[in-house]
Amino acid sequence: MSQVGLEHAANGYDTERYTRLRELAAEIVSKQSTLSEEEVQKSFAMQPGYITPKVDVRAAIIHDGKILLVKEESDGRWSLPGGWADVGDTPSQAIIREVREESGFDVRVRNVVGVYDANRVPNEEWMPFYHAYKLLFLCEILGGEARSSHETPDVGFFALDQLPPLSLFRTNRGIIEDAFEQAKNASKGTVFE
C-alpha cells in the first residue's frame, strides 16, 4: 500500500504518511526475518510504484544434445541466458536481445516451454519481497558466436548429466529438464503453474 501511495501521492502530506507506512512495514518485516530494517527499506525503495510481478525471460538453446548456459558474474554460477524483460519489448524481442547480449548468439524463438511462478521454486536466494514470473522459450541459433560479456564472463554448452553449479533463482534443473522434453517432443504442451 505504501509503494502505490508514494507513487500517486498528491501532496507532501500524503508523501509523509506513505513514507511512514513504508517505515512501519519495514520494521514489521525485519522483526519476522533475518534482515535489518535498513535492508528491508532499501529493498522496498528499489521497487517504486504499483507492485506487480516482474517478468524474467530465459532461453533454452539445445545444440548437439547440450544446452547453452552462461556463467553469471554476480554469483559465479550458471544459468540459461536471459533476464528481466524491458518495458516496450515483446517477450520474444526481450529474449532475443538477452541471448545476444549474454552469449553472442542470434536466435529465433521456436515456442514457449513454460510459464513458471519463480517464487514457488524452493531456494534461499530469491527476492524475498517481490514476485516474478519466468517465461522459458525454446530457441534455435541463427548465427553469431559464443562470447562473454560484463554480466556473463563465460558461455558453454552442457549435457543434462554434466550441468555446472546453477544460479538457482535464475535457472533450476527442473526447467532445464522441461526444455529437453520440449525439444524432443514438439507436441508436448506448455508447462504452466
PLM feature segments, named:
Residues 41-79, 107, 111:
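N-terminal strand-loop-strand
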Residues 85-109, 117-175, 191-192:
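Unchanged
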Residues 5-8, 28, 62, 97, ...:
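Short alpha-helical scaffold segments that flank and stabilize functional sites
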Residues 1-18, 24, 77, 150-193:
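Nudix hydrolase/Nudix homology domain
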Residues 12-15, 19-58:
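Acidic, metal-coordinating catalytic segment for phosphate/diphosphate chemistry
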Residues 54-66, 128, 170-180:
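Short, highly charged low-complexity linear segments
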